[in-house]
């Protein structure tokens, strides 16, 4: 009987033809025995219900203050601790703060034993990231948001170090200051 009903819905679709606009879509099997006006009403009602229901999933993290059902370790997005990474050409500094801006962990390439030109390398930034992650996980941090500032060579290495240290990164934000033709830049290096 079900096969007969499904073939009936196909017949109704083919009956509508190419030029006719009476039939909106494929009718469910239970609506075949109803009249054409009622069939159009039910199809229109289903379309408006689909359009009216908003999708709860978003590819982007929620805006602060916006309601969201997403949670990490039982915390809302606004309550997840933040790792601030300042990547300069000479050093990389990492500070992990709570949602209330209380410092949880701090590390830099200089505090990890790298000196002079070695502080500005990716290996030093990765080591500083691992050290900051170890200090933060000791205080119970499991998930983290990352805010990166600067264009140094340790940008991505520091994030990799945080993940290698056991923290799960849920968002990465680039907060590098960009002048809109502000101060005159420093002179170009002559090699």
Curated annotation (Swiss-Prot):
One of its GO terms (biological process) is mitochondrial translation. It comes from the Eukaryota. GO terms for molecular function: structural constituent of ribosome. It is found in: Mitochondrion. Residues 38-53 have a biased composition (Basic and acidic residues). Keywords: Mitochondrion, Ribonucleoprotein, Ribosomal protein, Transit peptide. The keyword Nuclease does not apply. Residues 37-62 are annotated as: Disordered. Its main location: mitochondrion. InterPro entries: Ribosomal_uS11, Ribosomal_uS11_CS, Ribosomal_uS11_sf. It holds the Pfam family Ribosomal_S11. Transmembrane segments: none annotated. GO terms for cellular component: mitochondrial inner membrane; mitochondrial small ribosomal subunit; mitochondrion. Belongs to the universal ribosomal protein uS11 family. Component of the mitochondrial ribosome small subunit (28S) which comprises a 12S rRNA and about 30 distinct proteins. This is Small ribosomal subunit protein uS11m. The lineage of its organism: Eukaryota, Metazoa, Chordata, Craniata, Vertebrata. The gene is Mrps11.
